[in-house]
Amino acid sequence: MFGGKGGLGGLMKQAQQMQEKMQKAQEEIAQLEVTGESGAGLVKVTINGAHNCRRVEIDPSLLEDDKDMLEDLVAAAFNDAARRIDETQKEKMASVSSGMQLPPGFKMPF
């Protein structure tokens, strides 16, 4: 059942190493900042790995325009930044688990 490369002991060691790598990756993700854009870069929103908004930049030309449009652009820029953080998190976590010899069909929780 647990044959090959060290049996259960080897699997436990792999799991511990993976846990350490995941913790390091999560710490790195928390430090990340990404910027999402909308309106061809007229609105930019920067968020960190915890999805907290760090900065909002609005091109001065938009301040003369429709308030509803500006609100929509800010929301779209935030959503773009959140999508980028999510993609980065998935990439980092996938790289952590890439060396593990997992059973067929095993799904990681990320």
Swiss-Prot record:
Gene3D superfamilies on file: Nucleoid-associated protein YbaB-like domain
Alphabetized UniProt keyword annotations: Cytoplasm, DNA-binding
Domain of life: Bacteria
SUPFAM superfamilies on file: YbaB-like
Residue ranges of coiled coil: none
InterPro entries: YbaB-like_sf, YbaB/EbfC
Pfam families in the record: YbaB_DNA_bd (PF02575)
Gene Ontology CC annotations of this record: bacterial nucleoid; cytosol
Subcellular location: Cytoplasm, Nucleoid
Similarity comment text for this entry: Belongs to the YbaB/EbfC family.
Subunit structure: Homodimer.
Function recorded in the entry: Binds to DNA and alters its conformation. May be involved in regulation of gene expression, nucleoid organization and DNA protection.
Listed NCBIfam families: DNA_YbaB_EbfC
Protein name in the entry: Nucleoid-associated protein Ent638_0951
Species this chain originates from: Enterobacter sp. (strain 638)
